[in-house]
Amino acid sequence: MSTKDAHDPFATPLETITHDPLAETAGLKADYDKRAYGEANPALMGTLEKDDMANRPIDAVEEVPTTSIRKWWVRLTWFTTWWIPSFVLSKCGGMKRPDVQMAWREKFTICAIIFWLCAIILFYIIAFGRLLCPDYDKAWNLSQLSQHAGENDYYAAVRGTVYDFSKFYKGDHSDITNLQTSSDLMLQLAGQDLTGYFPVPLSVGCQSLVSDTSLALMPTANNTPLISQAIHTSGPLQGDTSSKLHDINWYPDRFLPFVKKLRKGYYVYSKKDLANQGQWRNWAVIHGKVYDLSNYLNTVSTYQTNPAYSFLDSSIVSLFKSQAGSDITADFEDAMSTFNQTYRGATQACLDNVFYVGRTDFRDTARCEVQNYLLLAFSVLLVTTVLAKFIAALQLGTKRSPEQQDKFVICQVPCYTEGEEELRKTIDSLAGLEYDDKRKLLFLICDGMIVGSGNDRSTPRIVLDILGVDPKIDPEPLMFKSVAEGSKQLNYAKVYSGLYEFEGHVVPYIVVVKVGRPSERSRPGNRGKRDSQILLMRYLNRVHFDAPMFPLELEIYHQMKNVIGIDPAFYEYILMVDADTRVEADGLNRLVANCADDSSIIAICGETTLDNAEGSWWTMIQVYEYYISHHLSKAFESLFGSVTCLPGCFSLYRIRSSDKGRPLFISNRIIDDYSENRVDTLHKKNLLHLGEDRYLTTLVLKNFPSFRTKFVPDAKALTSAPDRFGVLLSQRRRWINSTVHNLAELVLMPELCGFCLFSMRFIVFIDLLGTVILPATAVYLVYLIVTVATKSAPIPYISIAMIAAVYGLQAILFLLKRQWQYIGWLVIYILAYPVFSFFLPIYSFWHMDDFSWGNTRIVVGEKGNKKIVAGTDDEPYDDTMIPLKRFSEYQREVWEEEAAAPSMRSGMTGASGPFGNSQAILHSGPPSVYRAGGSAYAGSVAGSDYGAGLGDYYQNTNVLQKPAHSRQTSAAALSQMGGSQAASMMFGTGTPSVYGMAGMGSMYGMPGSSASMYGLPNPMMNTTASMYGLPPMLANPLGANHSPAHSDIGVSMPVSQQNTGGSHIWAQPPEAATVAANSGRGSGMQARPVSTLSALNATNPFGVTAVARALAVNEASDPTDEEIKSAVQTYLANQPSLMNVTKRSVREALVAAFPNAELSYKKSMINKAIDDTLSGGAQA
């Protein structure tokens, strides 16, 4: 057995297979590509796989190391859910598998953490302050009391207590003859301290100290009541004996019991007010209570000869005189300690009953203030963050107009279940971009043979019909490894390529259709969006490193390099666009221009708005959210160069660095992390299955922290938002859960810029906290509205200020940007706020484990390393099933083997397989067979006879019958007129141009036989060219000729128009040259197409293979300016193409030519010499 066979799992000869599962299709003739599939027929792949894996132990236990964070999380999970037995989850919850049960436990733990976090926050904001300061909302000072002076809000204070007289003051409650009260008179007293209007008889208030009922205090001028008829004098001093006030016990027996029902709280004084009024009031603080002896001292002073008025001890009175407005508690206790218990009690009762006027404002104490200060600190922090985001978004100025860029860009579009209208909109918008058509490639990946809801065809068929691909084109599926578990890692896909014309734009495209294994029945080929992204990323990575490739990747390489005519290594950027997104015409150019200006940008995104804003109520509530999420969050993060969420619907990634060509987006680090197959934990499920686009951004930031991710508001795209609540619910479930898990990853990432609170990690933490407490925010807002509406508590000015700051700054933002329509969208968004902040998060958190769990691996242990056992119901898979080969080796083998090998179909020299003849379509039938219903668009190699045996390859191919013909090549349909392009446009024949010019060369007017599409003749190369006019991919490098009568493409190709030399990037094997010389000119067969990077000339912008002669070394240490200018002219004159020459490369060449000279200070002179030479101003 050869070395190749030893490593080839499909080396089993077909003769050893006794059963043909497709024997009923024996009448159909087709063959398969052994180089792409190995030695096995793809239709029998399932049988061969099982035979190959028969000796492998299927129940082998695989140990996966567990991180310390994972171990601690598992402990916390079990600590939280220990009281829920596993058999309950199995019996009641239907969760039979341990990994599903563990995910439910993790979900429950996360929901419990979120619940307690929300509860703690609500408790702290609403209830914690009440526990620390129970009567915080039951105290009023003079200014606060004066606010309750309305007809329906009538508050007043009497002896340190606030009462609500709103339901009392309107009635006539006077029983004094000829004295009536009115509501107007009563309103004059609202919101005031009415202590002076309710004097207490001294014989009642100070029973043990005063016995004379005729004694009364004389108020000072400042304490004299202004409305005399409102004074409630009781006892013998009341002149009207018929009034109830004549009763000396009216105050304690009638008044106090009545107002007790109206009590609201305390009347308080601040220490500042006490000190200020202490200049004219003799009051002081004792044990937090305020006593006012001003009227007493005024009375004593007035009646100095009557000792009955001096009923208080002089030691007590002297304290009020000497320390007015101060706290005299200590001195008061010292004075009271000299009294006996009876006199001490009588004195204290007298002070409380007659001279008590209120309390010190306890709300100013540390116990009551600590919560407010903490809330204020958090509020300032949040408002500062919002203000910073506002300033970041406030980028006023004129809209920039960058120059047209010339970088090569791949526009990747993953397609799943979208409808024809959405797909056409996306494809047309990309084709119509104001960007050089030759430098953009539409790369569409159809994720499985899926028929979307409401579609009458599968998604791949819709895509191919839009592009104009002939339904008869049926390429053979090729193997590649998918991102999946178990046997689903083996996948098959078909490749189509061609040109798509839209409104004058002619853009190349490649369509990859994942079709799956032959045994797949449910959603064949579908592996998810992440697999589609990895497919392209891994392919470009292998192109960059010239690494061994899967058969599918080899075919894509061939299609890009030999059919489309552009080396895949030329592409510098990947534009990722969803299949329901429409990019504005200048969007791509703006993104590329920003990346070209700043080489440190690794990824960039633009603004995404809604294309169906007024589609339904559910779309309208999303308009404002989309706008703010871009212009606040992303604009702010962009200032730090750390946009944490680049939307998958419209983002541009840099493939390699601009200085040294290091792989960036296609680096092994990103691909290895992003292509994780074992997604068996809740965290990984949310990262890789729900939020793959966001996690991709996280990986970019994690692996390349020195590079920047940016947001450009000028680049715009429009996407379709969910217009039904069910779809919105599903989308937000994915978004919210993936946001939580991705932010948790970013919080642990020390590479983010900044330090401590001044860092992106802190901003990420704030975003994470804000996401998980969204339900608490909604509940608090409801509480706030109810509190303010019912006036059951003081107005929370801090909370209202925060809300005003958040939405006020947002309103200022779109008003300054003159986006007036967002005023209405803001109102709609506020109305729908409960949906976004409460219902959707609650639903999302509880359905965090809502996945489709595979059955390939079952977790059997969580202690130490995780042990995983392969499921016995899964088909076996091993990486050795898929052959790998470098493109250069593969191509060299093709040249060596097929140049001399007879074709299975016609016996003529040529190549079959993915790199077979791209021009000749070998068939024994007449040429007319290939002219009917043709298309100008090509797939990869066809899997069945052209026009016969159509349908599914696995169903319609008899793989055991010896094939009589070689399969068609990928350019089979280029011979026909179909879609939007004619065959003559593709092959540069001598036929008249469809644009009315003399004759067609290449598609874009590069080297051709005559005038190109754009009228650029090329006298240097008298041959046909590639799709883009590069060296002729469809020319005959071996000198073969096609006769007009029997030309496979139905056009005349004179010998003079064919390249008999065949310059190409690969050295032509001597064997191929010999065969070419002996093949004859009438064989009707062309050999391998030549490279797109050959036969360079001045009009070939892509030619880079010709090597320019190096400048002669000059040992002078101080060369003259003339010598330098001469060297510049010589270097530029030796360049085969100036398209890839930069000023920097010229300067580097000069540094090498003058090794002993210091040329850095002559940079400006060198640049001027370059400009003069290119403009023709320099003299040779």
Swiss-Prot record:
Glycans are attached at N737. Induction: Expression is slightly lower in the yeast form than in the mycelium and shows a maximal expression in the log phase at about 14-18 h of incubation. Highly expressed during the chlorosis stage and the stage of white tumors of plant infection. Belongs to the chitin synthase family. Class V subfamily. Its main location: membrane. It is found in: Cell membrane; Cytoplasmic vesicle membrane. It comes from Mycosarcoma maydis (Corn smut fungus). This is Chitin synthase 6. Polymerizes chitin, a structural polymer of the cell wall and septum, by transferring the sugar moiety of UDP-GlcNAc to the non-reducing end of the growing chitin polymer. Plays a crucial role during infection and allows the fungus to overcome the resistance of the plant that checks growth of the pathogen and eventually eliminates it. It catalyses: [(1->4)-N-acetyl-beta-D-glucosaminyl](n) + UDP-N-acetyl-alpha-D-glucosamine = [(1->4)-N-acetyl-beta-D-glucosaminyl](n+1) + UDP + H(+). Keywords: Cell membrane, Cell wall biogenesis/degradation, Cytoplasmic vesicle, Glycoprotein, Glycosyltransferase, Membrane, Transferase, Transmembrane, Transmembrane helix. Its EC number is 2.4.1.16. The chain crosses the membrane at residues 108-128, 374-394, 762-782, 795-815, 822-842. One of its GO terms (biological process) is chitin biosynthetic process. Disruption phenotype: Does not effect the dimorphic transition in vitro, mating, nor growth rate. Leads to important alterations in cell morphology, particularly at the mycelial stage, and in the staining pattern with calcofluor white. Reduces levels of chitin synthase activity and subsequent chitin content. Almost completely abolishes virulence to maize. It comes from the Eukaryota. GO terms for molecular function: chitin synthase activity. The gene is CHS6. Residues 1118-1175 form the DEK-C domain. One of its GO terms (cellular component) is cell periphery. The lineage of its organism: Eukaryota, Fungi, Dikarya, Basidiomycota, Ustilaginomycotina. The keyword Chaperone does not apply. Gene3D superfamilies: Cytochrome b5-like heme/steroid binding domain, Homeodomain-like. It is an enzyme of class 2 (transferase). It is a multi-pass membrane protein.
